[in-house]
Structure formats: structure tokens, C-alpha cells
Amino acid sequence: MAKATTIKIKLLSTADTGFFYVTTKNSRTMTDKMTKTKYDPIAKKHVEFKETKIK
């Protein structure tokens, strides 16, 4: 069986609220760590989210 190209990742808020999004990424085309600016409802503003592993 072939290895899956898409993997699940966790995008953790840099505002230190503990809020996170779970999304997928293609591990072949996106080899570096993903960062996105998204809304953090606990901080009530848009902040940067950085990729971490799902445990």
C-alpha cells in the first residue's frame, strides 16, 4: 500500500490561548512548516497560527 500524501496537522495559536485548528496538508508539495493568519475566538482577533504535530 502506498504512503498517503496528505497528512493531518494542528495549527496552534501564537497568542498562547491554546486554541487550535486541525487541517490537512500535502506533504510532498509543502515540505516546510505551515503558518496562517486566522481568527482566534479566545483572543478575539486575527493572529498567526503555526503548525504542530497532532499527538
Curated annotation (Swiss-Prot):
It comes from Rhizobium etli (strain ATCC 51251 / DSM 11541 / JCM 21823 / NBRC 15573 / CFN 42). It comes from the Bacteria. GO terms for molecular function: structural constituent of ribosome. Belongs to the bacterial ribosomal protein bL33 family. One of its GO terms (biological process) is translation. This is Large ribosomal subunit protein bL33. Disulfide bonds: none annotated. Keywords: Ribonucleoprotein, Ribosomal protein. GO terms for cellular component: cytosolic large ribosomal subunit. The gene is rpmG.
